[in-house]
């Protein structure tokens, strides 16, 4: 009966946590990675006001709370809050006892060593996990696409990375990080909608803007051409009804918003766009493997969900690459959750079972065991 216990797979992103059971094809729980504590000491004594809220509940009570994002740019920066999020994940979302299941966590590329040790320590000491493993997010996305070699462009809410992977191993010297992702695009959308005279101020409206961004924005194949079309006709205009019944119209903002991924200068950032960052990452790799990378550019994360993004990537990278090079962009439809899906696949492989760090190994070697067993 030993085999019956499913491993737990937790993908903690800057914006959303994805959690579920290994072997499933989608996460059971997806909720915002936020923690909130009351702004004022409880005036209402005995009203059962909790001292902390996590996820959707924190989101809905944000008026009376101070909200914190414990994961910034993909890296955990506040361990107390992170622990609360994990506790909430196990007990409230998945309703499991963590001491009964192996736990697979994901980490950002280039996650500092001390962070990996801290994750390991919390899982074994606070949650008493029987076994644990930590895997790099981009590597899991690549597995989910059925590959072991390729370059992953992983763009979520808080950070974007380009990660070249060869035979299942990420190549750290060639990983590049771009601090431009979904949250920045949402903020940019507010800014350009304000130029149109629509104002959004509260956090509640941040959710609305995110919804507008996800439903109406797209990436243009040729930015100048799209701008011209937009200025000459209203063919590109779409309307959106706000919760209060007000209808707003959005035109060139639809493609100007995600254009910032290719032209960060629109946000006032001196950085390369995602196409150039991908190219630069490939150029940092050995000559012999570049062909395999150009032929397997895998998109992952919520910010790669815009329609038109793969055609545009194809066009931009083909322009940068050597002329004879075959460039292939892979954009799986489930890429919003492909990190989690890759984790679910990995943790349920029979060959992976000897890779877990067991509680016994942890007790013998301490947190540094993670560097020997997970790479």
From Swiss-Prot:
Its EC number is 3.6.4.-. It comes from Puccinia graminis. Its main location: cytoplasm. Keywords: ATP-binding, Cytoplasm, Cytoskeleton, Hydrolase, Nucleotide-binding. PROSITE patterns: ACTINS_1, ACTINS_2, ACTINS_ACT_LIKE. It comes from the Eukaryota. SMART domains: ACTIN (SM00268). It catalyses: ATP + H2O = ADP + phosphate + H(+). Coiled coil: none annotated. It is found in: Cytoplasm, Cytoskeleton. This is Actin. It is an enzyme of class 3 (hydrolase).
């Amino acid at each position: 009966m030993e085999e019956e216990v499913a491993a737990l797979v937790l993908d903690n992103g800057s914006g959303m946590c994805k959690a579920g059971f290994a072997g499933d094809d989608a996460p059971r729980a997806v909720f915002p990675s936020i923690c909130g504590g009351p702004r004022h000491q409880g005036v209402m004594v005995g009203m059962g006001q909790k001292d902390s809220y996590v996820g959707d509940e924190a989101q809905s009570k944000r008026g009376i709370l101070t909200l914190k994002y414990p994961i910034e740019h993909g890296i955990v920066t506040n361990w107390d809050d992170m622990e609360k999020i994990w506790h909430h994940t196990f007990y409230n979302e998945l309703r499991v006892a963590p001491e009964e299941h192996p736990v697979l966590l994901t980490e950002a590329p280039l996650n500092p060593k001390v962070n990996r040790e801290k994750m390991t320590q919390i899982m074994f000491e606070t949650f008493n996990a029987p076994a644990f493993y930590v895997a790099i997010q981009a590597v899991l996305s690549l597995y989910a696409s059925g590959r072991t070699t390729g370059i992953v462009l992983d763009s979520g809410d808080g950070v974007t990375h380009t990660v070249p992977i060869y035979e299942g191993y990420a190549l750290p010297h060639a990983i590049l990080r771009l601090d431009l992702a979904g949250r920045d695009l949402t903020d940019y959308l507010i800014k350009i909608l304000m130029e149109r005279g629509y104002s959004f101020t509260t956090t509640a409206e941040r959710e609305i803007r995110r919804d507008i961004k996800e439903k109406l924005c797209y990436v243009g194949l040729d930015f100048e051409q799209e701008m011209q079309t937009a200025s000459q006709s209203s063919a590109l205009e779409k309307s959106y009804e706000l919760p209060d019944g007000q209808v707003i119209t959005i035109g060139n903002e639809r493609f100007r918003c995600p254009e910032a991924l290719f032209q960060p200068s629109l946000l006032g950032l001196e950085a390369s766009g995602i196409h150039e960052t991908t190219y630069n990452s490939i150029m940092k790799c050995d000559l012999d493997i570049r062909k395999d990378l150009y032929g397997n550019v895998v998109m992952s994360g919520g910010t790669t969900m815009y329609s038109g993004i793969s055609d545009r990537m194809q066009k931009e990278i083909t322009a940068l690459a050597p002329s004879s090079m075959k460039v292939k962009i892979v954009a799986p439809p489930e890429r919003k959750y492909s990190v989690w899906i890759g984790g679910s696949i990995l943790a349920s492989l029979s060959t992976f079972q000897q890779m877990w760090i067991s509680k016994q190994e942890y007790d013998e070697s301490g947190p540094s065991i993670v560097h020997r067993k997970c790479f």
